[in-house]
């Protein structure tokens, strides 16, 4: 009897260990979302152009950047200001932006980021696509108060000399301020091929790097860059194609979207290469990583990645960088996407997306399950 009991206990222990091992190996269940078709409310009979970017500040105010000059001429008199601030219910709180004294407003609005101090950063990619070089392009990043007062401009329009330039950027796609170090990370990707880092207060250049932590090429890249996902072996070419997004996680990992090479590369904040991941390909549609957001839990378990190829948001388990789910399909309906471009998340885990070209809208996706 004693032997029989021992055997049963041993079997139970082995079964438990096997179950725990299987659970540890299984990917986490992807969170699910429901679109809020009423968000946001656009007042004053305003018209939006291409909505190029979106961000959420420390108060859960949502900042939307759009391109008024992309609106058809017949509707342009009703164009909303380029910068719109909403609350989570979709109510407009403020609006501003455009050309002004003392700064170079972008020729083509591209990225917006609201930092932990609620300063609002604007980037542009005016001058693209055409041959890159001195005298062309939005070669600056702008920092504003939430009320639209200029605080800082890094760089000047048409002044970039390329990847080695420590004063100007060149048609930057995106920016992110790492609150812990007060450093501004720039996806300097339409005219250059680098991540550039500046002091967020003074604008002083600190460092830059290319793909795999390599030194970026001295010569300016073709504009637009040629997709090269199969060059350089299975990991792709040794330099970035188009650096379209950059984010830093709470644990200090820098995420970079290399749009034309379908790869997500991660680095330390000093620029040391860590790992690479790719979006899963579906059929013949080439994946296009274009933007990031993190889940709201303390460990930021999930990484959300804009995939402008099949027009969806991919969900990654951040620990393994395994793709475990997707949000959305291509189409015009609420919850669908057509040229989804950038994204953001609020403190409750809800997601916000920006669409250019056809749909020209911002959308909100409410977190309905987290695991």
Which role fits each region the language model picked out?
Residues 1-7:
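N-terminal secretory signal peptides that target proteins for export/translocation
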